[in-house]
Every structure is written in structure tokens, then in C-alpha cells.
Amino acid sequence: MAMEAAAERSAGAGAAATAAPESGGGGAGERRSRFRRICVYCGSAKGRKASYQDAAVELGKELVERGIDLVYGGGSIGLMGLVSHAVHDGGRHVIGVIPKSLMPREVTGEPVGEVRAVSGMHERKAEMARFADAFIALPGGYGTLEELLEVITWAQLGIHKKPVGLLNVDGFYDPFLSFIDMAVSEGFIAEDARRIIISAPTARELVLKLEEYVPEYEVGLVWDDQMPHSFAPDLETRITSS
């Protein structure tokens, strides 16, 4: 949690601090964005449908057209490889964050852009969140869902106000969204928290929705290592070990 807290100290203010796009990269017809970097979560596999692969490339090109740099999981295989190459080939900066232990498995050939090797998954997620102004999930598996749900939860808790989007290719995320809707109807997720999740079937439509997103919660929650030292003992006296 300490590493995630360090990331979110920057992330809470990051959207405002990095809203202005940087110069460089892209072409003369580039559509500017309020986002400097978008973090993309996606699978290290390509999936069984060509539409998933096409969507990864489409998303990469959309980021390039809008002058947005990419933050991602650092792999060169699967959808990660496709989206990172599309952004890099288009002249935008790519930041890949990957645990050292995963490099032999997920990096083949020459990696693109800037590769940051970290100690483990917690540091990876914290670094990706720190660099990003928004988050997009392409189709993926357990790892993609874990990363996605963490930033959704952080938004619900008011730790950050960065938009979170699903690129819902061929209805891939329909079952997930149905589960969220059921959790709302059963009283486990608040209706305003449901609106944290933005989805669209195409990259262009999704990025437009992210641009228009208005946060549901105010940033303000802090982790225990950010609290004043004088307050921490009062908390500790209420905690018992099992």
C-alpha cells in the first residue's frame, strides 16, 4: 500500500498538473487533447478474434492523432505489443512499466520506447497510475481486470479523479458491465459509483467520452502513511491483531 500511496500522492493532483499536452511528436493534423498520457491495460495475448487486435491498433492510432503518449505494462507480445508499436510508430512517447521477473516472458525482441523495470506488480501499478492522466482497458484477462478494478476503486474512494474507460470491443465487457449493474441493484455499489466506468465500442468514441468526463468524487482520501504522526497512535489503539 505504501508504494500505491506514493503513486497517488502524485495521481490526485496529476490530472490538473499534466492536463496541457506536450509539444513534439505527431503530425500537423493532430487533434489536441487535455490528456498528456493515457494508461492502457490489456492482455499479453492477442485473443481469438481479429477485432481485438484491430482495436488495439486503432486505439494506438487514436492516441497518436490526439497527441497523447502511452503508458502500459511494458510487454511486446499480445495486445500490449500491438498498441505500443502503433503509438511508437506514430511518433508518440511510450512508457512501459514491467516487473523484472516478467521480462523474459513478456518482452521479446527489441522493446519500444522507454522501459522501466520495477520490483513487482504493486510497484508496476503504482508507476503506471502515477504517469497517467486517464485509464483505458482493452480486452484482457485476470491481470487486466485487477488493474482496472483497482483504479475504479481508487476513483470511488476519492483517491484520484482520472477517468476510467472500457474499450468494449464486440461486447467483450458486456458480462462485466452486467455484473456491475447487478451489484448496483443489489445495493453493493452506489449508483453514482457506477458512473465512474465509461465504455464505448470504438477508440474514438471512448476517448471523446473520457475527455468529457466529470469526476463523481472529490479527491481527498489519504492512506495511513500520509496522516499526521500525532493522529496515527489514536488509530493504532483501536486496532487489534487476530
UniProtKB/Swiss-Prot annotation:
GO molecular function, one term: cytokinin riboside 5'-monophosphate phosphoribohydrolase activity
Comp. bias intervals (Low complexity): 9-22
pH dependence: Optimum pH is 6.5.
Source species, domain of life: Eukaryota
GO cellular component: cytosol; nucleus
Binding sites annotated in the UniProt record for substrate: 106, 124-125, 141-147, 153
Subcellular localization, as worded in the UniProt entry: Cytoplasm
Keywords: Cytokinin biosynthesis, Cytoplasm, Hydrolase
Region annotated Disordered, chain positions: 9-30
Pfam families: Lysine_decarbox (PF03641)
Tissue specificity field: Expressed in roots, leaves, stems, tiller buds, immature inflorescences and flowers. Expressed in the upper part of shoot meristems, including axillary meristems, meristems of developing panicle and floral meristems.
Changes seen on gene knockout: Premature termination of the floral meristem.
Catalytic activity as recorded in UniProt: N(6)-(dimethylallyl)adenosine 5'-phosphate + H2O = N(6)-dimethylallyladenine + D-ribose 5-phosphate; 9-ribosyl-trans-zeatin 5'-phosphate + H2O = trans-zeatin + D-ribose 5-phosphate
GO BP annotations listed: cytokinin biosynthetic process; regulation of meristem development
UniProt keyword annotation of Cytoplasm present: yes
Presence of keyword Repeat: no
Other remarks on this protein: The name lonely guy came from the fact that flowers of the mutants often contained only one stamen but no pistil.
Functional note: Cytokinin-activating enzyme working in the direct activation pathway. Controls the shoot meristem activity. Phosphoribohydrolase that converts inactive cytokinin nucleotides to the biologically active free-base forms. Reacts specifically with cytokinin nucleoside 5'-monophosphates, but not with di- or triphosphate.
Family assignment from sequence similarity: Belongs to the LOG family.
Protein name in the entry: Cytokinin riboside 5'-monophosphate phosphoribohydrolase LOG
Native species: Oryza sativa subsp. japonica
The organism's taxonomic lineage, starting at the top: Eukaryota, Viridiplantae, Streptophyta, Embryophyta, Tracheophyta
